[in-house]
Amino acid sequence: MLLSLHGQSKDALEKTRAGAWEYDVIAPYFKCNMTDITAAIGLSQLKRYPEILHRRRSIIERYDEAFKQYPIQVLNHYDTDHISNGHLYLTRLPGKTREACNQIILQLAEQGIASNVHYKPLPLLTAYKNMGFQMEDYPNSYQMFENEITLPLHTCLSDEQVSYVIEKFTEILRKNQ
């Protein structure tokens, strides 16, 4: 509640009760509540959610099958204990450095494929460096980041585009062994 009300201790409804106008600002936060338009778009998207999940799962299964024969570790999206919404397709390339992965990302870009990294450890970001965070205090975070590449995974990808990503990613990996 605090983040959505500029740090106020009461919401608007609580302040409308007779004699209950008094409130405090706990900290200088933000006003991040959802607008009516955003809510309407969200409700519309929720109707499509099963279709979105199905398409993402289809892409994930194609990627998983294609990458089985390569030295690629992938985030497990589906198991007996959990089911993912398939938001991201994270790969890890054991033995590769961040610099090597950055080169692979550039080579993918040259082929028209937008890849990413999820996520850069907070101690590498200026705001956190300025607060005194040091990367060496978070070795696991760096280890997860060091050789990670996120491949495209969205419902607008056609089957042909998924095949293209698979083809180019594996081709680039073979060249960079």
Residue ranges and their predicted role:
Residues 1-177:
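PLP-dependent aminotransferase class I/II
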